[in-house]
A protein has these predicted regions:
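Conserved "HGTGT" condensation-loop signature of ketosynthase/thiolase-family condensing enzymes
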Residues: 1-109, 113-155
Length: 155
């Protein structure tokens, strides 16, 4: 069996965007769940509670060309991965493109907006709102794909 070594940590979470903040808030048993007024418009939804990710800013190198095929799920995955690579001292390391490093990233689904666009297409029999990037943003493996492309990971 091959070994996997975790050498860096990165996060964009409701508890914070760096490990020291996240760890401190976990130790404090900080509750970040809140009432989400944006969910008030959903008839039959019996909860309004959630823990949204705190606002975050992307560095300048996350330009339109780099992010145009990414939804929010992928952007967050790429940025969290970048923070982990920085923490590990591996950002820009030749290992990334050596074929010896892979990606395992679970996001369950792609971006909800893109899923909604496809749902609209199915329900209303129109491709209005569908672009060349909508499927890429919707696919469940969107974050893993975009992490690989963004950092040139070939393994």
């Amino acid at each position: 069996m091959k070994r996997v070594v975790i050498t860096g940590v990165g996060a964009l979470s409701p508890l914070g965007h760096d490990w020291s903040t996240v760890r401190a808030r976990l130790k404090e048993e900080r509750n970040v769940v809140q009432y989400l007024t944006a969910w008030d418009g959903y008839e039959g939804l019996n909860t309004r509670m959630g823990a949204p990710v705190a606002p975050f800013e992307l560095p300048a190198h996350y330009n339109r060309k780099a992010t145009r095929s990414m939804g929010r799920v992928a952007v967050m995955g790429v940025r969290a991965s970048e923070l982990a690579l920085i923490d590990a001292g591996l950002l820009g390391d030749p290992l990334l493109s050596s074929g010896r490093l892979g990606i395992s990233y679970g996001s369950s689904v792609g971006s909800p907006a893109a899923i909604g666009d496809f749902g609209n297409m199915i329900s209303h029999k129109t491709t209005e709102g569908i672009t060349a990037n909508t499927y890429i943003k919707m696919m469940s493996h969107t974050a893993a794909v975009d992490i690989g492309v963004f950092f040139g990971i070939t393994g």
